[in-house]
Every structure is written in C-alpha cells, then in structure tokens.
Amino acid sequence: MFKYALPLYPTMEISTESWSLTSLERINSFIEIGNQDEMIYINKDDSTKVFDEIKPMRHQILIGNMMSSRSPVDSLILMHGVGTGKTLTAILSIINNISDTEFGMKRALILTPNRAILSSFKEEVFNCCMHHYGAGFHTNVEHEVRNIINELFKFDTIRSFCNKIAIKSDEIIHKEWNASFIVIDEAHDVAPSGIDYPKLNRFMKILSTRKLLLMTATPMRNGSSDLIPLHNLMMKKQVHDISLEEFHGNYVEINRRRPPSEDGDSIVFSVETPKIAFMTKFAGLISYLPSDALRLDNVNVINVGDNTTYGGVLLSTTNIVSHNMSELMERIYSGLLNDNNNTNRRGDVALLDQRQASRFIFPDGQYGTLGYMAWMNSNTGKATLRFKRELRFGSNMETVLGAVEKFSPRYANIAKTVYECARRGEKSIVYDDLVTGSGLLVLATILEAIGMKRGSGSNRNSFVCMTREVMTVSQIVAAQRVFNSPENYDGSIISVILGSRVISEGLTFKDVQHEHVVAHWNDSETEQIIGRGIRVGSHSKLLETLNTPVTVKVYRHATIYNREPDKSVDVIMYATSEMKRKNINTITEALRSIAMTCPELESRSISRTICAFTPHEENISNVVPLHHPTIRRTFMDRLNETFNYEKDEYFVTRMENFCSAYNLNYQSDGGMRLMFILLKLIQTTPQLDINKFINCDGYFVYTTKTVDEYNSCRTLRYPFDVSYKSTKRLYYDTIVSLITEPNLIKAYETNPNYPLTKLPLHVITIILEKAISRKLLLTSDDEHQNAYHIQALDTFKQYYHIVYESGGGSNSNSATDIKAVCWLSASVAGESTKYRICVSDQNTWKDCPDDMKEQVNNIKVTKDNTTIFQMREKSLSHYGQKNPFSNDFCLRVIPQNSLSAKYDKRRIASGKKCTTWDNATLGRIKQNLGIESPLLHERTTMSRSDSCKLIESRLEEIDAVVTDVACGVQAKRK
C-alpha cells in the first residue's frame, strides 16, 4: 500500500554498516532450504510446467528467489562459469520478480554486446515464456505469448541503448525505465575506457528502483581493475563509485614481476593482492559458481597437446598443440624479428604482424592484409583462381594438404582433423579472432580445396563461416539453429563452424566434440570460447543417441619458431595468458570468499553455503561488511548539510514529527520496527505512475525535474540511536523478517495502531480502487478479501458504486462498459475531473472521459438520493456526517426533495460542523432524537460540545451517520 511513495532520484547508501553472518544465513537458508524446488512468486501450477519442461537447477532457483521483490538484494554480479545456464537463471529471476504484481518490477530490460547474442537471448525468453504463459491460451498461443513478451521484455544492444538514453533527460529516463529488472549479459564488455560506460552509469544512477543482474563468467580479463565498472553500475550514488586511481591505491596491492628468462626482453606482469578494503567493498555483491561445480555427467573434456616452457618456466596449466614453422614461414618470421625498423617493433604492441605470419604465408611470401588483397577476393571472401591453382584445387586431399604445409602447417593440421572428424559424424568448432588477412577466410578456402562445402548440405562435409564479414546476424542465428537441431547431432547437415568474435560470447553450440582455438592475450577469452560447446545439457541428444559417454577434445594451437621458441608469438601469448590467469585466480578466490552465495566445491554440490572470509582486523571479525545499495539511509537523501542528527534534542524532534504523522511510537521497539518496514517498502517497491515521495515530516510532495532541488529536501537517516540505544540490530532483524515472514506486512496493515485513515488521500483512493476490483472478481466460492480491503470498502462506501458485480444478474458485455465508479477524490476537490471509472477490460481504472462524466454524475446523485431517502425513512430532520481523517462530526439537514443531476455543484454537499450550530437548534435536534425532554424545566444545560457527543452517539445507534471526507473542511467549490 506504500508503493506509490517513491523518490525520483535514488537514496544514498550507508558505507559503515554491515550484515552479520547470522542475518545472511537467515536470508539464504529461507530462500534455499525453504524453496529449493520452487520460486517464491511463480505459483505451483506454473512452476511445475517450467520445471517439467526446462528443469532449472537449484542454483538457478536460488538466484531467482534472491532477486525477488521480497529480497533486499537489488544488485548482483552473476559470476557463474560458462555453461552453467546464466541465461535461464536471468529469465527465471525476471519472471519470478514480475509475477509479484504487488511489489515486483514493471518490466525487464535485456542488454547484450551484439545482436547475435541478443537474438539467442530472445529465443531463450520465448521458449521459457511458452512454458510459463502458453498454457493460459487455447488458440494463437505463439502470438499471445509474443504479445506478453513484447509487453514485459525490452531488448537492445548495449551500444544502441546507450545512444538512445544519451539524448534523454533524467526525468524522461526515470519515467520510462524506473522499476525495471535490468540484465546485462557479458557485462565484462562494459569497459571503463569505452564510450558506453559513462552513459550506462548515468542511466543506473537516475533509477530509484530497479533490480540489476550483471552476467559474466569472466568478469576479469586482465586484472582486478576490470571489476570497477561492474561495481560502479551497482552503486546508486556517484559518490560511491570507484576510480582507477582510488582502486589501485586503496583496494589492491600491486607488485610487478618479470619471469626468469635468458632474454632480457621477457614479459613484465603484475601480481595483485586484494586488501581488506577490497573484501569489504565487494562483500555481498557476488554470486559465485565455477564451471566445474556442475558435474557434466558422461561428458569428458580432454585438453590435447603437451605443456611447453617460456623463459625456462613450465606453463603448467596450458596444453599446446605445437606446429613447427615451415621453411618459408621461418624465413618470413625471422625477417620480422630482425628488422629493427619494422613498425611492429616500434608500435605494434599486439604483435599483429607476427600473429598473421604465424597463421599463413601466401605463395609470394606476403601475409596479412597485403597477402589477402593479392590472393583473395575482398568482396566475396573467397580465393582467386591463381590461389586455387597454388592450393591444387581438384586434387586429392593428400596433395592439397601437402601444398598447404609449406604455407601453414597449422591450417593443414586443422583441415585434416576436422575433415576426418566430420566423416566420423563428429562436429567441430574452429575459432580465430582474425578473419581477413591470414585468418579464417583463408582456412575456409583450404577446407573447400579438400572437398568440403560452404553452407548447409549433406554427407557430413559442410561448414559455415560465422563471421560478420560474410554473414548477416540473421544468417548467423539461422545457421546456429540448424547446427543445434536434433537432426544435426552428427553433423549430417553442418559439421564444422568457423567462428570469429561474434560467436565467442553468449551463444551455445550443441553436440560439439572438437574445439580448436588460437592463442589469446588472456585466458578469459579462451575460457569463453571453449564454453560455447561445453555447457549443461549441450550434449543431451548425442548422449541419448549413442548411449555412451561423450569425449570433447580441446586443441590450443601454437605455431613454433624453431630457432628461438621463446620468440614464437603464440608461446608469448599463452605465457602472458597463464600469468594473468594466476593473478586473476587470486582475485577470484577473494571474491569467492565474500560472495553472497557460492558452492561447496569439495563435494561438487551446487547447494548454497555462506563462504565467510576471516579478516585480519579484530574489530570486524564475524562480520561481512556490505557496501552496496541493499542497505541505505532513509528514503530521502539527507536531512541537510548543516543539520546535526547526532544531537539528541534535534534528532528526537524530527523523529516525533515523522512518527506522529504515521501514528508510531518511536520510543518502543514495535514502533521502530514498523517504521523500518514502512521505509523499506517505500525504498524498494517499484514506482508506478505517481512521482511522489514523503518528506521528513511525513507529508507527500511532488518531485522536481532537477536533482539539486530533490537533494535540498530535509530527510531522516537510519539506522540510528534512540535514547542512546542502538536500533541497528533491530533494523537488520526487521529487514530479514520481511523476507522470512511473508505475512508480516499484512499483519501490520491490519494492526489498529496503523489505521487506514492515516494514509494520504490519493493512496487511499488507490487502495479503494484495488479493493473494488478485487470484489468484482470474487465469487461466492472465493476466499474473502483481506481485512484492509474490507476496511476501505466499509469506511468509504459513500464514494463508490458497483454497476456490475460478480455473480450478479446482469453482466457487462462491452470492454468499455462501466463496471464501477469512484468519486472519493472528487468529493474533496469538488471537480468532476476527479471521477474515476473501472471498465470491463481487465478491471482497469482510469480517469473518467468527458463523454462519460454525465453518466457518472447521475450514478453519484442516485447514490446520494438513496442515502437521503434512507434517512427520511427514519423520520429524521438531520443526519450525521463523520470525517474519517479529522474525526470532525457534522450535521446535515435532510432535504425534502431529491437531488437533481443538475443541482448547483458550487454548493458544499457536506453539512456544518456540529459545534458551529447554535444551542437552540441543537436542542431541537436532541428533542427529535428523544435525548432531551420537550419540557423546559426538564432540560439540562450543557455545552455545544457535549450536545454534539450525545447527538453523534444517538445517530450512530440508529445507523444515521455516514462518512464524509469534506465534513469540517472549509473550502470553496469552483
């Protein structure tokens, strides 16, 4: 009921507060153990459909419940390994959240790095929604489900979305996107130095209410500083963002080292050690699940090749398939190393020339772009006629591969391997980040030379090039669908994928048994690529058909410069990657230790456990500090810059103002507990259509277009001390109780210490409309409405009328028929523009249009005449009116004639306040009611106030007092 009281701008986080491990355990044990097989808000019938068809795993259910509207977690880095089902985790989390129509988000916003991933995400959303929503339709199921998706889900690429919001004002962004469940897939692509990050960070700072899920298996590519943009996106105030300089100075300790090598030109790499400040800064922001925490039953992964050395140091975690350079390649490569004037030595820090030359040397000794332009058709990406002759097109495979050997031993080996695997019915993926030059398109030409066909086909000899140079996004998605189809489990339609960066993230390839990758500067890239073909459920069709375990082989290729192996660019890249991996593993272990949830790796279980780290400082032992928006000050920003809230006399005065407005006793634990519930509901519940919030005195005020004016509003802060007694523990216990006790809010709503009439009028109007809608849907067999709705319907029965009621004799046929009307706001404002109507279409409420105002006014007058007739039947001259907000009591003369629909609207419809009537009139009224003797000597002299109390009591006994919100309000009607 408090969800309409929300700020336009976000609140400031507390930076010195902490969750206790006990509180975290209560949250997680409730979500995990109490709901290990079902979502909180997806009802059992729906969840059964989802589970039967999609079979979400326990870690997916856990995250879905942690990101529900009931949970205080509003931002999370989903650091789950490749192949663990992050997409389904996100979709289930969204559906679980928005299924809570009371406090869930309004919509989902899905952002991905490119359109290929976006298309794949859309397909996953459709499949999941078909299972969840499809059963509710009998015809045009697909069309209806897509309509639901279009309403609830918005999709875009990161770059496109950032360009759109860059030209919009804060107010427009807040109105369009507040209360959204935002998912950013492959979030590590949001780089702090990129052009998208500032725009996206501004967008996140504007939203006062949102859930944010950052999905990435590899949040760090080069080091811990890659975490900075992810952290900042989760912060709701700019003041809590971390700069690169601050991060390196306060959060990690950096030491630079050089591995032992005879060559003084070896690589210098960094070793980062996280400090306690790092641990506390990221505590509670991470959900951690490595790929190997999920057992891939009957799928064995083999890394083909041997370990190599660099600078005399064994690369212990990297198996390499080595290819010795041919004589031609060595000659060209040696020239690159020895030519001191080569731009590669001066400016090509990525060693691109060496990488091109290590892949393929064209027949004339050129490589890269120059060789490609001379030997390939740059428009079609296919070989020229003279290149085909050099490759012996039309000859047998041995002849072709013999010709290829002198240009590229690596390509000859890959071509032979994938060809033989295809003939055996085993599918392959070949990945390279270089496409033109000496890259993938040259390899595609070699595959064509040995007899394989480009595009889908038959006889297990077809391949496709999934690159933007030769295929559109729609073609890539279509090819992926064919490759993953059950009919193609053995590669009978497409057996080989040649993929560039477009397939390196977010896509799934099924039933793959061979993966060929090239060297990268960081192991995260390689891990992402390998994960495209090794995922949960990715080999289900193959396992079902073969009924035997499946082996997936991973080939990490390297071309070796025989004269000086340590100067082979592939070896240098693998060595750099392994060094970065060792450094990143240290940071990953730190994140794992302070993750909100993580698996018990020892038992390979995916069940939840609290992974607490042991800090070195005694004063924060047994505590996981939490520096993120799930714990905030009150629902406003700050009291003001000069207000000293620590001084008890000022503090208590402000607390009294607030608590008085909400009928709370700030000196009792119960009153404070209810206040925390109020504040938590206000700050975490989606704002719908009303831009209003409550100021420190408990009154609703309108927001403004500028954040500066918003920040100038005086506000309260909490948790705080009351009478020198800390309420911090009470605060945390209350927040946890909101999660673990679902009926707690309803219990407080029906508590007599917090009556309905303490709410502002516009909130009561919304509650009344909701109660009427609920009553319209009820049948005699339905569970009765909740007590709060009953109170609203009974207290304000004079201000609404139900035209069509469930189970009644008449039915509403048209979607535009009026089912109910409400004029509560109009009775205060005195304007017909405040009339509200409920139409038949889904019991929706809206402002009354001009052409219906006369009809609604007739209904209102009829209701008033009914009241007058009932009072006239009691033989009364006056009847009572009671203002539920002020408790004022008024008397109104019963008119002799019925009211007309054309009566003077400028007249005040309510009676006069009882205490303003003269004693003589009050005496006559008391005589009429039989509470005063007509004999003068028997009358007692009493004050007007006492007379009014007697009259009010008597009229209540005979049911002659009605609710009137205008009673006692001296306002002119215009």
UniProtKB/Swiss-Prot annotation:
GO terms for molecular function: ATP binding; ATP hydrolysis activity; RNA helicase activity. Coiled coil: none annotated. Keywords: ATP-binding, Helicase, Hydrolase, Nucleotide-binding. SUPFAM superfamilies: P-loop containing nucleoside triphosphate hydrolases. A motif (DEAH box) lies at residues 185-188. It catalyses: ATP + H2O = ADP + phosphate + H(+). Residues 67-237 form the Helicase ATP-binding domain. Transmembrane segments: none annotated. It holds the Pfam family SNF2-rel_dom. The keyword Transferase does not apply. InterPro entries: Helicase_ATP-bd, P-loop_NTPase, SNF2_N. It comes from the Viruses. ATP binds at H80, G81, V82, G83, T84, G85, K86, T87. Its EC number is 3.6.4.13. Residues 413-595 form the Helicase C-terminal domain. The keyword Nuclease does not apply. Belongs to the DEAD box helicase family. DEAH subfamily. This is Putative ATP-dependent RNA helicase.
